[in-house]
């Protein structure tokens, strides 16, 4: 499986390294970078993005880093610098804004898992034509899991002994939907670019 963009590697490594540093220093950086409704209302809008890069503890960071690295490995033929940074910025912003405007009772939030769902959904949609059966199956599993997380009685505390907090399932929903929007947006832009290139070549 050939990488789509070999120059993505240092960009990917930069994000991973940033998460490791922030994860190791979570006790110091979380008060400044985590989702904090009161602080956001006072103008600290960067928290809508940076909240996805910080974590509750080292285990929380490692779990999400493992997911990110696996996505980077399995979808190396689909990701390039534009798509990667579009995911981080677009899904980060959309998920952060959704948490702020839709979950008005939410006061604090940290973690990559929400937008990690967005990356996974985006890559599965982007690569669907190459392996439709497998990608459809995984998308159905993700959709089923998200639906189950939204059901009353779902145990949001199942990872508390590891991550020192509950799983905030709405972030998974918002992140996955952001991934769908990202796929639509990038597909539209790339299709438009190809059409313009084709029209130019025919002239």
Regions found by a protein language model. Name each.
Residues 49, 93, 118-123, 140-148:
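Small-residue-rich segments of transmembrane alpha-helices in multi-pass membrane proteins
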Residues 14-86, 90-96, 101-109, 161-171:
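N-terminal TM1-TM2 helical hairpin plus the immediately adjacent luminal interfacial "cap"
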Residues 140-187:
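Terminal transmembrane helical module of multi-pass membrane proteins
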Residues 1-46, 71, 78, 89, ...:
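N-terminal signal-anchor transmembrane helix
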Residues 64-69, 116-122, 172-186:
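Hydrophobic cores of alpha-helical transmembrane segments in multi-pass inner/ER membrane proteins
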Residues 96-101, 123, 143, 180-184:
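Alpha-helical transmembrane segments of multipass membrane proteins
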Residues 105-138:
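A contiguous pocket-lining binding segment that forms or flanks enzyme active sites
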Residues 23-27, 75, 100-103, 147-153, ...:
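Transmembrane helix-loop junctions and nearby membrane-interface residues
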């Amino acid at each position: 499986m050939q990488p789509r963009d070999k120059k993505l590697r240092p960009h990917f490594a930069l994000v991973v390294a940033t998460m490791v540093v922030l994860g190791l220093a979570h006790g110091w950086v979380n008060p400044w970078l985590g989702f904090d409704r009161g602080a956001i209302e006072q103008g600290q809008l960067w928290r809508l993005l940076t909240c996805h890069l910080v974590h509750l503890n080292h285990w929380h960071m490692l779990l999400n880093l493992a997911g990110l690295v696996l996505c980077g490995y399995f979808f190396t033929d689909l990701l390039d610098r534009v798509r990667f940074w579009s995911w981080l910025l677009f899904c980060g912003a959309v998920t952060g804004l959704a948490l702020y405007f839709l979950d008005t009772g939410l006061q604090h939030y940290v973690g990559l898992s929400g937008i990690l769902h967005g990356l996974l959904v985006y890559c599965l949609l982007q690569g669907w034509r190459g392996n439709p059966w497998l990608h459809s199956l995984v998308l159905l599993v993700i959709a089923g899991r998200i639906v189950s997380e939204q059901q009353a009685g779902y145990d949001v505390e199942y990872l508390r002994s590891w991550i020192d907090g509950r799983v905030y399932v709405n972030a998974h929903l918002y992140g996955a939907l952001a991934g769908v929007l990202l796929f639509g947006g990038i597909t539209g832009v790339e299709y438009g670019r190809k059409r313009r290139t084709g029209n130019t070549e025919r002239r």
